[in-house]
From Swiss-Prot:
Homotrimer. Its cofactor is Mg(2+). The active site is at 352 (proton acceptor). The gene is glmU. Residues 241-446 are annotated as: N-acetyltransferase. Keywords: Acyltransferase, Cell shape, Cell wall biogenesis/degradation, Cytoplasm, Magnesium, Metal-binding, Multifunctional enzyme, Nucleotidyltransferase, Peptidoglycan synthesis, Repeat, Transferase. The keyword Nucleotide-binding does not apply. Residues 1-219 are annotated as: Pyrophosphorylase. Catalyzes the last two sequential reactions in the de novo biosynthetic pathway for UDP-N-acetylglucosamine (UDP-GlcNAc). The C-terminal domain catalyzes the transfer of acetyl group from acetyl coenzyme A to glucosamine-1-phosphate (GlcN-1-P) to produce N-acetylglucosamine-1-phosphate (GlcNAc-1-P), which is converted into UDP-GlcNAc by the transfer of uridine 5-monophosphate (from uridine 5-triphosphate), a reaction catalyzed by the N-terminal domain. This is Bifunctional protein GlmU. It catalyses: alpha-D-glucosamine 1-phosphate + acetyl-CoA = N-acetyl-alpha-D-glucosamine 1-phosphate + CoA + H(+); N-acetyl-alpha-D-glucosamine 1-phosphate + UTP + H(+) = UDP-N-acetyl-alpha-D-glucosamine + diphosphate. InterPro entries: Bifunctional_GlmU (IPR005882), GlmU-like (IPR050065), GlmU_C_LbH (IPR038009), Hexapep (IPR001451), MobA-like_NTP_Trfase (IPR025877), Nucleotide-diphossugar_trans (IPR029044), Trimer_LpxA-like_sf (IPR011004). Its EC number is 2.7.7.23, 2.3.1.157.
Length: 446
C-alpha cells in the first residue's frame, strides 16, 4: 500500500505567507496529523506532493517520507500524476493534507473494503447538513460520480453526501484512468474525482463520524477543527483516569501521554511528545513542550520545554525550564527561576529569582535568591559546577568556568571568579564601612 498526500496548494483563503498544511492544530502542523494517521494505519510507503513554498512543508517531514513537487498547481488529478512514478504497490490511498482529523481505523477500513470486493476505487464520503465547499457524491444507475461544487448544478448542490477527498485505488486502474481525464471544466484543472466515473467497480463508503473528513480552508475552520480535536483528546484522557478541570481551556497534542490520577488545571498547554507520569499536578497557566515528567511532580504557572523532570520535583510558580534541563528527584525550582542546559541534583532547591545556565548542581544544594551563573563571556558558554551539600547565599554571581567544592558556603552578595575548595567559606564582596553619625547634622540641601 502506498499513500499519496496532497499538500501542494496555496490555500488562498488562509490569507497566509506559509502553506496551508503547515498551520498547526494543538501544536502539530496539519500535514503531520495526516502523516500520523497514515503511519498508524500501517502504511509505510508515503509520498507527499508539495508545491507552494515546498521547502517549508518538506522541512516538517520525516526522512522516510518521499516528496515530489507539483511545480504548477493544475488540480488534484495532476498532483497524483506527478506522484505516480513513485508508486510501487498494488494499492494507492490518496488523502489531502488539510483534513487532519482522519483516523487510522477509518483508513484501515477503507482498504479492507476495497480488497474484499476488488473495487477499482473506494471513495470515503459522509453527509453534511451544510455541504458548501465540497464535491457531491452522485449515484446514478449503479454508477458513481463526483461533481466538484464549482461545476455543480443547483440540483446537485442540494445533495448532502460529500466527497471527503480520500480514495483507495487499485494501482493499475489509477494509472489508466489518469491518462483519460482532461481539464475541460470551469477551473481548467485535472480533477482526480473524474477517475471515479471511469471505474467499472466503484463504491462510496460513508464514514460515520463526519468530523474526520472536515477540511480547512480558512482560519475560522482551523479554529473549529482544533476545538473538535481538543474535545476528542481531552475526553479520551479523562476516560483513562486523568482529571482535566476545564477541558475548554486545556490544549493537549495528540501524542502526549499522561498517567492516571494526574490533574490538569485550566489554561494549560501540553504539546509535542510530552510524557507525564501518575499523580502529577499540572497548571494552571502552564505550557509544557516535548518533555518527560515522572510521577508525583507539580508544575504550577510555568514554562517547560525539552526538559526531564524526575519524581517528586516541584516547579513554579513562574519558573522557566529551557531545553537541556534535568531536575532529579525532589528538586524545587521556585518563582522567577530560569534553568537552561543544566542538571539539578536530588533534593536541591533554587526557589527565588535565579538563573542557572550550563550548570551541574549536586545533591542537597541550596541556591539563594538572586543567584546568577554568569555562563557567557560574549563568545562562548562556560560551565558552573556546584558539588553536593553546598550552600550559595543570596545575590551571588558565579562567573564561569567555576567550581564550588562539596560542602562549601558562598556568602551572600559574593562575586565568585575562582574555584572554591571543598568545605570552604568563600566571600567575594567589598567590606562594609560605617561612618557613625556622618549625616546627623546634615542640613537640608547640603
Amino acid at each position: 500500500m502506498t499513500a499519496i498526500i496532497l499538500a501542494a496548494g496555496l490555500g488562498k483563503r488562509m490569507k497566509s505567507e506559509i502553506p496551508k498544511v503547515v498551520h498547526s492544530i494543538l501544536g502539530l502542523p496539519m500535514i503531520n496529523w495526516v502523516l500520523r494517521a497514515v503511519k498508524k494505519a500501517g502504511i509505510e510507503n508515503i509520498i507527499v506532493v508539495t508545491g507552494y513554498k515546498a521547502e517549508i512543508v518538506e522541512a516538517l517531514l520525516p526522512e522516510d517520507v518521499k516528496t515530489v513537487r507539483q511545480v504548477k498547481q493544475l488540480g488534484t488529478g495532476h498532483a497524483v500524476m506527478v506522484a505516480q512514478d513513485a508508486v510501487m504497490d498494488d494499492e494507492v490511498i490518496v488523502l489531502t493534507g488539510d483534513a487532519p482529523l482522519i483516523s487510522p481505523e477509518t483508513l484501515i477500513n477503507l482498504y479492507k473494503i476495497r480488497r474484499e470486493k476488488d473495487y477499482d476505487v473506494v471513495v470515503a464520503s459522509t453527509f453534511q447538513e451544510d455541504p458548501t465547499g465540497y464535491g457531491r457524491i452522485v449515484r446514478e444507475n449503479g454508477k458513481l460520480r463526483i461533481i466538484e461544487e464549482k461545476d455543480a448544478s443547483e440540483e446537485i448542490k442540494r445533495i448532502k453526501e460529500i466527497n471527503s477527498g480520500i480514495y483507495v485505488f487499485k494501482s493499475d486502474f489509477l494509472k489508466d484512468a489518469l491518462k483519460k481525464i482532461n481539464n475541460n471544466n470551469n477551473q481548467k484543472e485535472y480533477y482526480l474525482t473524474d477517475t471515479v466515473a471511469l471505474a467499472e467497480k466503484a463504491t462510496a463508503h460513508v464514514i460515520e463520524d463526519p468530523t474526520e473528513v472536515l477540511g480547512v480552508n480558512n482560519r475560522v475552520q482551523l479554529a473549529e477543527i482544533q476545538k473538535i480535536a481538543q474535545k476528542k483528546i481531552n475526553e479520551r484522557l479523562m476516560l483513562n483516569g486523568i482529571t482535566i478541570v476545564d477541558p475548554d481551556t486545556t490544549y493537549i497534542s495528540p501524542d502526549v501521554e499522561i498517567g492516571q490520577d494526574t490533574v490538569i488545571e485550566p489554561m494549560t498547554f501540553i504539546l509535542g511528545k510530552t510524557k507525564i507520569g501518575n499523580n502529577c499536578l499540572i497548571g494552571p497557566m502552564t505550557r509544557i513542550i516535548d518533555s518527560s515528567i515522572d510521577d508525583s511532580v507539580s508544575i504550577i504557572r510555568s514554562e517547560v520545554e525539552q526538559a526531564i523532570i524526575k519524581s517528586g520535583a516541584r516547579v513554579g510558580p513562574f519558573s522557566r525550564l529551557r531545553p537541556g534541563t534535568t531536575l532529579l528527584e525532589n528538586t524545587k525550582i521556585g518563582n522567577f527561576v530560569e534553568v537552561k542546559k543544566s542538571t539539578i541534583g536530588r533534593n536541591s532547591k533554587a526557589q527565588h529569582l535565579t538563573y542557572l545556565g550550563d550548570a551541574t548542581i549536586g545533591e542537597d544544594v541550596n541556591i539563594g535568591a538572586g543567584t546568577i551563573t554568569c555562563n557567557y563571556d560574549g563568545v562562548r558558554k562556560h560551565q558552573t559546577i556546584i558539588e553536593n551539600n553546598s550552600f550559595i547565599g543570596s545575590n551571588c554571581s558565579l562567573v564561569a568556568p567555576v567550581k564550588i567544592g562539596e560542602g562549601s558556603v558562598v556568602g551572600a552578595g559574593s562575586v565568585i571568579t575562582d574555584d572554591v575548595p571543598p568545605y570552604s567559606l568563600a566571600l567575594g564582596r567589598g567590606r562594609q564601612v560605617i561612618k557613625e553619625g556622618r549625616y546627623k547634622n546634615k542640613e537640608k540641601g547640603e
